[in-house]
From Swiss-Prot:
Family: Belongs to the PRA-CH family.
Name recorded for this polypeptide: Phosphoribosyl-AMP cyclohydrolase
Organism: Lacticaseibacillus casei (strain BL23) (Lactobacillus casei)
Higher taxonomy: Bacteria, Bacillati, Bacillota, Bacilli, Lactobacillales
Necessary cofactors: Mg(2+); Zn(2+)
List of residues binding Zn(2+): 75, 91, 98
Catalysed reaction, written as an equation: 1-(5-phospho-beta-D-ribosyl)-5'-AMP + H2O = 1-(5-phospho-beta-D-ribosyl)-5-[(5-phospho-beta-D-ribosylamino)methylideneamino]imidazole-4-carboxamide
Length: 110
């Protein structure tokens, strides 16, 4: 059994969400033990909102639910990779992914 490291980030686990089909990274959010348990129980993503200090069911308002396919744990047991089938855009701006901007803006580093 894998033991997750909840202590490193004060009870939170960084969670990378990836489209199970396209492999595109959709978003990064945080889970606490309760949101991970709800994710496991419902098969849909739940997160902890650091700003609102409350649980957050992704897509509950927008309808853009994320159905969980797999959950992987990194080598340090402090980050999760959750693959999902998204029902719509992941970003609150309406973009498919929250990673639609480049830094520095408009420039490639190569």
């Amino acid at each position: 059994m894998i033991t997750l490291d909840w202590e490193k980030a004060n009870g939170l686990i960084t969670t990378v969400v990836q489209d199970a089909t396209t492999k595109q990274v959709l978003m990064v959010a945080y889970m606490n033990q309760e949101s991970l348990a709800k994710t496991m129980a419902t098969g849909e993503t739940w997160f902890w909102s650091r700003s609102r200090k409350t649980l957050w069911h992704k897509g509950a308002t927008s309808g853009n639910i994320q159905t969980v396919k797999t959950i992987a744990v990194d080598c340090d047991a402090d980050t999760l990779l959750v693959t999902v089938d998204p029902a719509g855009p992941a970003c609150h701006t309406g973009h498919i992914s929250c990673f639609y901007r480049h830094y520095p803006e408009g420039k490639d580093l190569t």
